[in-house]
Curated annotation (Swiss-Prot):
Name used for this protein in its record: Pre-small/secreted glycoprotein
Organism listed in the record: Zaire ebolavirus (strain Gabon-94) (ZEBOV)
InterPro entries assigned: GPC_FiloV, GPC_filovir-type_extra_dom
Keywords: Cleavage on pair of basic residues, Disulfide bond, Glycoprotein, Ion channel, Ion transport, Secreted, Signal, Transport, Viral ion channel
Site (Cleavage): 324-325
Superkingdom to which the source organism belongs: Viruses
Xref: Pfam families: Filo_glycop (PF01611)
Highest classification ranks of the organism: Viruses, Riboviria, Orthornavirae, Negarnaviricota, Haploviricotina
Amino acid sequence: MGVTGILQLPRDRFKRTSFFLWVIILFQRTFSIPLGVIHNSTLQVSDVDKLVCRDKLSSTNQLRSVGLNLEGNGVATDVPSATKRWGFRSGVPPKVVNYEAGEWAENCYNLEIKKPDGSECLPAAPDGIRGFPRCRYVHKVSGTGPCAGDFAFHKEGAFFLYDRLASTVIYRGTTFAEGVVAFLILPQAKKDFFSSHPLREPVNATEDPSSGYYSTTIRYQATGFGTNETEYLFEVDNLTYVQLESRFTPQFLLQLNETRYTSGKRSNTTGKLIWKVNPEIDTTIGEWAFWETKKTSLEKFAVKSCLSQLYQTEPKTSVVRVRRELLPTQGPTQQLKTTKSWLQKIPLQWFKCTVKEGKLQCRI
């Protein structure tokens, strides 16, 4: 029943469980009773959670911050769809917050956009902000756009995740994943809660086989970036391009790239050659691979936490993470509205607590 049943899955199934299941396993080792019970595909608030929420959160030392990628929510990750979630705006200062652990990302993005006059659209990354460290595919977009604003923000309030730092804005030429920052509550402060230390980074992580990590950069050219008339081209080489469509998966683009090279269908002049893909061609190749590693259950399930009640000003919502299924006849799912996140409303000051007349009183 419940969590215990999950923990008895065969060994090969463990490899395909998602981040949330590992969170449950880690908590299972921390507590003597289960963190939650899964019933009707819904993770219910457990007695442990209620206990922690009632009177045990005495210091932010008990919080562990985790970056969660939006692609786990089933949002469309192709470049045309993803870029529609971002927009330029002035008058809002950028915010940066750190997080301690995160997921590996299937899709990351890297933008180099200029205005028509040649000036830069995006600010350079401040000192200490490095690219997201674990991306299977990096979608590198170069091009031009009006860029009507000082910074590029996420229209739905999510963060841009960098290397253990999450920012509200996009930095020039710095790889990021879309996500939010969540907090795990521990019964007491634990320094060694995350037992796996960060991998020792080789000089070039993408080529060192010992790192067990491989990343592929896919290049695009954009015109009218950030407008409703944006046009994207997938770059085969500096003179050969393919018109980009939302239905193209990274695996399909890589196969397309290989086909252009081996079949000799590249530009052999000084002019630009642009190909268009036949609408009847199935482009869903490889889409299952990512979701096999991300899936948690075959149906939707919700994760509830008392943290949402600490500084809640809007109606309470649950964060829903769902596996997206694609049939052979379907293209990628349309852009989904991500849940408005209360995670960003949690103040990051220290809690100062004292016991007065037998009651725990905390102030910020």
